[in-house]
């Protein structure tokens, strides 16, 4: 009888050990994608792209090469398109966006774009053209300035003080981001990664301060990339921080850096 008890105890210990080892293995796989796997390649590609953040002086883009596909002409140095936009919809109210896009032409070493304010209709999710405001801007000496007279001093000041996320965002701890959800489409090619962030994350704190985001909900980070995973050059990089996402209530921030053919 004593022998059977010892045997049963031994079997229980073995089963428990195997179970714990299995859990640890699954945890390691979720937190740290296996080296050489598609997930690891995606994270490595984003790591290379995000390593350029921040670029405080936008004029540095004039000397930065990007991923070139078949649409680029041989003599075209390409254009960087950078965008940053905050989207807010308080509960039960209209969705409003405000942001800027800038075309940085490497051929002419000039940069121009728009500062845009929009309202989004809840019925069809389209821009209400009657409520859209668009102001032309240009970059001179790493400063954004309006190209036309603006009577609204508040908007004028907002334009002149505007900073793109690429100028202050910092992903030095990206390698420590765990439990990512990955997807990959080799045909396009496009790929993505999603992470749950914490409120003490540097970028989260920056966005809360700059855009007066009062909610205490922890945001999700969605990264979307385009181009060859094995190529170190940037083709397209989209970043989205989602703070609130509910029917009739939304707060999220969009940022993108894209290398496109010059027009």
Curated annotation (Swiss-Prot):
Keyword Membrane tagged: yes
Lipid-bearing positions (N-palmitoyl cysteine): 23
Lipid-bearing positions (S-diacylglycerol cysteine): 23
Topology in membrane: Lipid-anchor
Signal peptide (from-to): 1-22
Pfam families (UniProt xref): DUF576
Cross-referenced Gene3D superfamilies: 2.50.20.40
Location within or outside the cell: Cell membrane
GO CC terms in record: plasma membrane
Disulfide bonds: none
The entry's keywords: Cell membrane, Lipoprotein, Membrane, Palmitate, Signal
Keyword Cell membrane part of the UniProt annotation: yes
Similarity field: Belongs to the staphylococcal tandem lipoprotein family.
Name by which UniProt lists this protein: Uncharacterized lipoprotein SAUSA300_0415
Annotated organism of origin: Staphylococcus aureus (strain USA300)
Organism lineage string: Bacteria, Bacillati, Bacillota, Bacilli, Bacillales
